[in-house]
Amino acid sequence: GSGRTRQQISLHSNNVMDVQWLTGRSFEHVAHPNQALADALFATCSADATVHLCKLGEPKPIKTFARHTDEVNAIRFDPSQTLLASASDDANVHIWPLNLSGLATSTTSVAPNDTEPLHILRGHTQEVYALAWNNTGPGSSHPDKPRMLATASFDHTARIWNADTGACLHVIQGHEMSVFTLCFSPCARYLATGGIDHRVLITRVSDAHTVYSYTGGGSIMDLAWTQTPRTQLAVAQSDKQLVVLDLSTSLH
């Protein structure tokens, strides 16, 4: 296209903190009976403590999730595109069910208190800043394994949760300051976490054992695994450096 503005809408009463397209993820593609509808859906979250599910072209949200009590920092759809996780300054993570089939014939805005979370994940003691779904469960490359969600918090920990039951599987306690970012490896076996303490920890998902650590020259702002067979992790740092770690021989 021409790069022109397709739509501009006022959805929130405070800063918009994150936005995610339903089908704009790196997981294995999931086909919907109404793919055109799925491609038009996106979610937003805000410092106004709400999460909106929106459809391109609609002037108002088609669904609002309003159970958090403080800023919502991050949102992520699961691999099956049937769940939405939200992380908040209220120290909780909510997992919301998505009934996309019910949206196929209706674009009517739903009342804010219409939907209860499937699970409220409690355990963090400070703000939860980042989320990541593992490549497990329905719609993933490992459908026989339970859905897993990782969360990063200013309480210096990350947690791995069973998203099917809401149970906390592991608490990762190796950081000395706020955990700012995290991501699972494509093979689903490892979780990388990055903190304000300049450290990257790579944890084995099965037992929460730290299998590799790296200390950079600044706070760790973002992490990204390669999607290629060679195991590499890109690390964005606050000291203006980008580091690529070759972990091919470090992870077993």
Regions found by a protein language model. Name each.
Residues 20-39, 76-82, 132-146, 183-188, ...:
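Loop/turn segments within WD40 beta-propeller blades
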